[in-house]
UniProtKB/Swiss-Prot annotation:
Family: Belongs to the universal ribosomal protein uL30 family.
InterPro entries: Ribo_uL30_ferredoxin-like_sf (IPR036919), Ribosomal_uL30_bac-type (IPR005996), Ribosomal_uL30_CS (IPR018038), Ribosomal_uL30_ferredoxin-like (IPR016082)
Keyword field contains Ribonucleoprotein: yes
Organism of origin: Geobacillus kaustophilus (strain HTA426)
Annotated protein name in UniProt: Large ribosomal subunit protein uL30
Record's subunit section: Part of the 50S ribosomal subunit.
NCBIfam families to which the protein is assigned, alphabetical: rpmD_bact
Classification via HAMAP family: Ribosomal_uL30_B
Transmembrane segments: none
Length: 62
């Protein structure tokens, strides 16, 4: 089965640069401690790397 990623917003985007805010929103995260599920692909991994200090990532098998 394909791997998926559970991405949780753990830190606020208040006071962060606009590009980081846009990246968090593009991942589908709106509120603190919200978790979204995405397929594991290079585009999503790149977005995670850009805001790694704001999110927590867990790999899940489905």
């Amino acid at each position: 089965m394909a791997k998926k990623l559970a991405i949780t917003l753990t830190r606020s985007v208040i006071g962060r640069p606009e590009d980081q805010r846009v990246t968090v929103r593009t991942l589908g995260l709106r509120k603190m401690h919200q978790t979204v599920i995405h397929n594991d692909n290079p585009a999503i991994r790149g977005m995670i790397n850009k805001v790694a200090h704001l999110v927590k990532v867990k790999e899940i098998e489905e």
